């Protein structure tokens, strides 16, 4: 069963974060520009800490960034006029992150309250790295299921994605930020900045727990 992340709370109402499922690490030093993409939401603190590290290291020209809409929506949708030959997806009640699109600049909150306008063209690319086709995903859920059709969730950000091998590398923010800190040095404008110094690692690890 697929649950909206807001349902992952303990008996006292505290958010109980699920274990991340994609835990591969970047083992080699990366020098290939825009091979990797970081998918984040400005409304997710785990995603924004990855984005902060990316900018602190000066990796914004070496790693592509894609921003999902900050307001959760149903992840199953009715088909539009352009999709009239496709079957309508069944609404199973799940809500989560969705990609902005050119036809819906205003996205309504599930409660009926409209969210802020989100400019699409500035952020939304989602193109095949070989430039031979454009793959459209409506939601982060679609993105996960496209890459692993047996995956049941949670459908979270951040996501570190390998655009060459077309695979989700990692969706655990604490591991992503360490790889951003150490594995992309040839692409980093601030390569000498070490955000995980040996002398502070024990303290950082304890705080992270």
Q: Language-model features: where?
A:
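GST-like domain detector, emphasizing the conserved glutathione-binding G-site
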Residues: 1-209
């Amino acid at each position: 069963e697929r649950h909206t992340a807001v349902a992952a709370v303990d008996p006292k109402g505290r958010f109980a974060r699920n274990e991340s499922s994609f835990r591969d690490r970047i083992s080699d030093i990366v020098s290939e520009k825009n091979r990797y993409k970081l998918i984040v939401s400005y409304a997710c603190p785990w995603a924004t800490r990855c984005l902060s590290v990316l900018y602190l290291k000066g990796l914004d020209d070496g790693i592509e960034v894609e921003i999902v809409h900050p307001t959760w929506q149903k992840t199953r949708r009715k088909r539009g006029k352009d999709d009239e030959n496709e079957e309508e997806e069944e609404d199973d009640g799940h809500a989560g992150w969705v990609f902005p699109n050119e036809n819906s600049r205003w996205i309504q909150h599930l409660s009926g309250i409209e969210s802020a306008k989100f400019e699409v063209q500035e952020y939304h690319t989602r193109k095949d790295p070989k430039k031979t086709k454009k793959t459209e995903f409506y939601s982060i859920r679609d993105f996960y299921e496209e890459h692993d059709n047996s995956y049941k969730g949670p459908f979270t950000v951040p996501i570190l994605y390998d655009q060459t091998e077309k695979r989700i590398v990692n969706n655990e923010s604490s591991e992503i930020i360490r790889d951003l800190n150490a594995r992309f040095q040839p692409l980093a404008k601030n390569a000498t900045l070490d955000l995980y110094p040996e002398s502070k690692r024990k303290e950082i690890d304890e705080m992270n727990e």
